[in-house]
Structure formats: C-alpha cells, structure tokens
C-alpha cells in the first residue's frame, strides 16, 4: 500500500511550485476542469500564475447534461472571470457514455444523446458538432474521450502539452502512483 512521504513543504506551496514548473516547461497547457472543488482550486492557482507570467492556457470542460444548475453557473462564472488568460475554453456537449448509478434497467447513459429528450439545452457556444474533434466517435466513453482529447490537443499545438487535472491525493493513496 502506498504511503505519503512528507517533504517539508505544505500542499499549497508544492502546488504553486509544480504549476510554475508546468508553465516554465510547456508552451501549451490545458486544465481538465469539472466544476468541482478540486479543479476549481487548480483553476484559481493556474490563473494566478498565468497572469503573473503573462501566459494563457486552455480549459476542457465536459458538460454531462444532467448537472446541477449551480455547477453550470459556477463554470460559466469562472470562464468569464478568467477569459483574459484562457486560450480556448472547450465546453464539450457531445454524446458520451457513462455509468448510470441510478438505474438497474439502464446501467449506462449517453448524455446529449441524439433523438433523446435532454434535461436542458447546452450553451450556444458549446461544442455540439461531432466533427469538431477528428477523434470523436458517437457515444464514446469519457475514459476513451479524455486520452484522445489529450493526444489531439498536443498535436494541434504542434508540441508536447501539459494537461492538468485537480485531484486531491488524500482522496485515494493510489493517486500517488
């Protein structure tokens, strides 16, 4: 079982050092943003450093259609708040398949499914055209979409890119690996 190794630096300072390193090392950076607390903190930290370094970064937000309205409002607020340092905000509202933990009849669910009645409409500027991403396949899983997006993003930028995701290690010791 993995164990924490104390390094003598607090989590905030360590995060800031790592984000600084990312911006110093990679010419292209993207934040994988869920609208949750962990990725929100990372968004704020990245924005702080990006402004100081006069850098920009992209953001990937996968809109699951059936999300709390307050989450959608929060994502919209942060998008507007950091528009000056956002390269591209990829608000993805494409059919993606995910596990459905609220139904024994339908163990998988496809958000934004063609021909289905949607919980709400996607924002007008969301990515809803399947042809936007050359790698996209209808109803692919999130687990397929993310690595495909990462490879596409790096190729689009013509270089190696850094994709950051906000996850607290304390949620799972396996995340140290």
What would you call each of these model-derived segments?
Residues 1-177:
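ATP-dependent adenylation/nucleotidyltransferase module used to activate substrates
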């Amino acid at each position: 079982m993995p164990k924490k190794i104390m390094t003598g630096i607090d989590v905030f300072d360590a995060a800031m050092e790592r984000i600084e390193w990312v911006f110093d090392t990679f010419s292209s950076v993207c934040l994988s943003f869920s609208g949750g607390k962990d990725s929100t903190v990372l968004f704020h930290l990245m924005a702080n450093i990006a402004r100081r370094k006069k850098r920009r970064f992209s953001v990937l937000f996968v809109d699951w259609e059936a999300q709390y309205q307050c989450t959608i409002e929060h994502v919209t607020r942060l998008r507007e708040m950091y528009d000056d340092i956002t390269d591209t905000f990829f608000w993805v509202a494409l059919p993606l398949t995910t596990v459905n933990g609220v139904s024994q009849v339908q163990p998988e669910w496809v958000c934004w499914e063609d021909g289905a009645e949607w919980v709400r409409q996607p924002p007008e500027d969301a990515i809803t055209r399947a042809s936007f991403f050359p790698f996209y396949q209808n109803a692919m899983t999130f687990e397929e979409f993310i690595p495909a997006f990462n490879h596409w993003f790096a190729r689009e930028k013509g270089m190696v890119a850094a994709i950051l995701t906000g996850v607290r290690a304390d949620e799972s010791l396996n995340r140290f690996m």
